Design a protein with these regions (language model features):
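Short, solvent-exposed positions on alpha-helices
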Residues: 20, 24, 45, 86, ...
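Amphipathic alpha-helical interface segments
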Residues: 32, 36, 40, 98-105, ...
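Hydrophobic alpha-helical connector segments
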Residues: 14-39, 95, 119
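Amphipathic alpha-helical packing segments from all-alpha helical-bundle domains
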Residues: 4-10, 56-79, 89-97, 101, ...
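Short, flexible helix-adjacent loops and helix caps
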Residues: 13-20, 49-52, 74-82, 104-111, ...
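Charged/polar, low-hydrophobicity segments characteristic of intrinsically disordered regions
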Residues: 128-136
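Amphipathic alpha-helical linker/stalk segments
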Residues: 1-28, 73-76
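Short secondary-structure transition hinges
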Residues: 24, 28, 35, 39-71, ...
Length: 136
């Protein structure tokens, strides 16, 4: 699973580069998280929800993965809104955190919502929030 964290970063970068349309970027980013989590749910649970994540090397890898994903998102936010990098990074971390936590929740609960329904709900709430920032 540790090497797969690089595949998540790549998937997020690919989602962002896939289109200039920000609503589709958000949708693709959320889908990338659900893909990542669903591909190997047991390994994901072990890594994120067990004592493994207190190990310094594992924790560092998880933090790096989150930072790299948020940095990819924040670059677009900063460019589109003119927000300073620090503010854009905070929003990027929030967006990535929301995607990660909601995808985990969906997986953990063996939800009656289909994956597509869950992704659409999360995409909708995140897009409605981030799209409120004026473009520069």
């Amino acid at each position: 699973m540790l090497f797969r964290s690089d595949s998540l970063v790549f998937a997020i970068q690919k989602a962002i580069q896939s289109t200039p349309e920000n609503s589709i970027r958000v949708q693709a980013t959320i889908a990338a998280y659900f893909d990542f989590i669903e591909a190997d749910g047991e390994a994901f649970r072990l890594l994120f929800e067990s004592d493994m994540n207190v190990e310094p090397a594992v924790r560092e890898r998880l933090n790096r993965m989150t930072y790299d994903c948020a940095a990819a998102v924040s670059a677009v936010i900063s460019l589109d809104t003119g927000l300073p990098q620090e503010a854009a990074m905070l929003l990027g971390v929030g967006l990535i955190g929301s995607a990660q936590v909601t995808a985990r929740h969906w997986l953990e609960r063996d939800s009656k919502l289909t994956r597509v329904q869950a992704q659409n709900l999360v995409t909708n709430i995140i897009w409605r929030g981030i799209s409120g920032f004026p473009r520069s």
